[in-house]
Regions:
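Glycine-rich, acidic/polar active-site loops that bind/position phosphate-bearing ligands
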Residues: 1-99, 108-112, 118-361
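Glycine-rich N-terminal segment of FAD-binding domains in flavoprotein oxidoreductases
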Residues: 103
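C-terminal amphipathic alpha-helical interaction region
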Residues: 293-475
């Protein structure tokens, strides 16, 4: 019932064999699953949704599908259609689709990798290095401006992917941490360091009839291989795009894409203003661009991180760098209503303050209701299913102890029933704990439900009720 009503198990013991051997990840796709995938792909293509990748993932019965890239609006719509189609096709093959980010405790959960890039209306890919220094300057310009957007709106990007369900997955050793940083790879990092450390005169020189000569290092074609190594980064550059890996598996990708697109749009407008200001002071255009890029490279350096995103050292370092390290879902949503976020959305014409406030009310309310439903389901399971079975087993043990005393001398009976006595005590201790905590959880919900502010109510559910779910599960 918990899996059916909430999308995840609220109780249950971890299986003896799950993903330890990695035999599912490296194994062949089962025949029935392959038939489901084939049927799904055909129906997706009939709807005009191009898909290509199919392979096993780490957790048992976990698989991956990858659509081919499209324009952002269309790709988001197609992603929602695929989710709906998956459910329908799965049922026709005798399967059930689980889109929850963490349906089973102890095995890997699910997520989406949003591959994001920029191109012109004439087909020029702005996130790909070129063959000339000028092409590479353009490439570096857009890379650095994207990093600036991620740096200045670090908390907002995290808020755009955060939810009650995705919170189970982020920060575990299967998903990016709940700190938004960007991995660039060794070669691209060296290029940015070269620009940062070189003066304008070193990078721009006169070259006879050619005009300006740029000393931008050649970026090799092997860039993709060198930038796809760090799987712990939530926002990694992978050759000709950034891969936003923190989006939840049941999420609408629009939330993350709206925040990212608006942030980059605002940053590009700021870049144009900064360059124009230098040109007005008499600086040549190329020199002005490089000067601003150098300034940006230094400014956004805190968001660049190529190390292990799972480590405790990174959490401490991220806090030192001033990155958003908040882990409370309701508090993370506050980033939408920060002055910088409101100014960004309004200046780009994406949303007004009122629209942002309304959306946040929905986010807080949804969070509260998700935890509320889980608490109700867990309370019902514990009181009406788990405890009755536990006490029934306890009664059998007690009966066994009494019969031991009837059959054997007191000392012998005590010796033989010692383990049963320990079990009887442990069951009593655990059932008392569960009963007390379920009752406490009910009372905590009553108190929280009286709070009028959706934000404060969500915080109460996060701080008080959500931890009880794990405590009850453990016992």
């Amino acid at each position: 019932p918990d899996l059916l009503l909430t999308g995840r198990t609220l109780m249950g013991h971890e299986a003896s064999k799950n993903q330890q051997l990695e035999d599912h990840y490296f194994g062949a796709i089962p025949t029935r699953v392959a038939a489901f995938m084939k049927d799904l792909e055909i129906q997706a293509l009939e709807l005009g949704i191009p898909v290509k990748t199919r392979h096993n993932e780490v957790a048992p019965n976990q698989f991956e599908l990858a659509p081919i890239f499209e324009e952002c609006n269309l790709a988001v719509d197609h992603n929602m259609l695929i989710m709906s189609l998956m459910r329908k096709v799965a049922r026709s093959h005798g399967f059930r689709l689980l889109l929850h980010e963490k349906p089973f405790k102890g095995v890997n959960g699910s997520g989406k990798h949003n591959n994001w890039s920029l191109g012109t209306d004439t087909g020029v890919l702005l996130m790909a290095p070129g063959k000339t220094a000028e092409d590479n300057l353009r490439f570096i310009t857009f890379i650095v401006n994207t990093l600036m957007a991620v740096y200045h709106h670090n908390g907002l990007l995290k808020a755009s992917i955060m939810s009650a369900t995705n919170a189970h997955r982020l920060g575990a050793n299967e998903a990016p941490p709940a700190i938004i940083s960007s991995f660039l790879g060794k070669q691209l990092t060296q290029v940015l360091d070269h620009i940062e450390e070189s003066g304008n005169d070193d990078l721009v020189s006169l070259a006879g009839k050619q005009g300006m000569k740029l000393d931008i290092p050649q970026i090799p074609e092997l860039l993709i291989d060198n930038t796809d190594r760090n799987r712990t980064s939530p926002f990694a550059f992978t050759g000709n795009r950034f891969e936003f890996r923190a989006v939840g598996s049941e999420a609408n990708c629009a939330s993350a894409m709206i925040a990212l697109n608006a942030a980059v749009a605002e940053q590009l407008a700021r870049f144009k203003q900064d360059v124009d200001a230098l040109i007005e002071k008499g600086e040549p255009k190329i020199s002005a661009i490089i000067e601003i890029i150098r300034r940006y490279i230094k400014e956004c350096k805190p968001v660049r991180f190529d190390g292990n995103g799972y480590s405790d050292e990174w959490k401490a370092e991220a806090a030192h760098r001033g990155l958003d390290c908040e882990t409370s879902c309701p508090l993370i949503f506050d980033n939408y209503l920060k002055p910088a976020s409101i100014a960004m959305f309004e200046s780009t014409g994406v949303m007004t303050r009122k629209e942002l406030e309304a959306r946040n009310e929905v986010k807080w309310e949804t969070y509260t209701k998700k935890i509320q439903i889980e608490a109700r389901v867990l309370g019902d399971l514990a009181m009406n299913h788990i405890i009755p079975v536990a006490t029934e087993y306890q009664s059998k043990l007690i009966n066994n102890v009494y019969k031991m005393k009837e059959l054997f001398p007191a000392e012998k009976a005590s010796q033989l029933s010692a383990e049963n006595m320990k079990l009887i005590e442990e069951i009593a201790r655990r059932t008392i704990f569960i009963t007390e905590h379920v009752n406490a959880m009910v009372e905590a919900r009553k108190v929280a439900n009286k709070i009028e502010s959706e934000r404060e109510k969500a915080i109460a559910y996060h701080d008080t009720i959500a931890p009880m779910l794990e405590e009850i599960r453990y016992h």
